[in-house]
Amino acid sequence: MMDEVLFETRGHALWITLNRPAALNALNHAMAVSIHRALFDACTDPAVQHIVISGAGDRAFCAGGDVALLGREGRANRALWENFFHDEYRMNQAIARAPKPWVALIDGITMGGGVGLSIHGP
């Protein structure tokens, strides 16, 4: 299975790549949690001076939350919706409060949660 989010240190930057190009890099719960965790680690690491996020593929930065998944599995599992949105909003809040510059390389389709990944950064 391919990693849905890639993390790489390049020089003094943490590079985050959303890696679901077939799904237009739509966010799922695991992605929101892993980005939030990586952001916390980067903000407490003095070697990291800024964070860069981009989307894999050539069609989208991020099409937002994975509404196909939420629609398919969320009907029988309300907690799936609640947990996803709770943790996605926590991630957005962490981005907004980050003490280090956050750069979103927006190229292609960007909607909903993709906008959240880009506009909240300092």
Please tell me what each predicted stretch does.
Residues M1-S54, A79, Q93:
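Conserved CoA-thioester-binding segment of acyl-CoA-metabolizing enzymes
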Residues S54-G55, I106:
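Short beta-strand/turn micro-motifs composed of small residues
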Residues M31, D66-L69, L117-H120:
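Short, glycine/charged-enriched secondary-structure capping and boundary segments
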Residues A26, R75, A79, I106-I109:
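Alpha-helix capping and helix-loop boundary segments enriched in small/acidic/polar residues
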Residues I95-P122:
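Glycine-rich beta-to-alpha active-site loop
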Residues A23-L24, D58-R59, T110:
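Glycine-/small-residue-rich active-site loops that bind phosphorylated ligands and cofactors
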Residues G55-R90:
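Glycine- (often His-adjacent) and acidic-residue-rich active-site loop
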Residues A38, D87-A98:
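Catalytic-core regions built around general acid/base machinery
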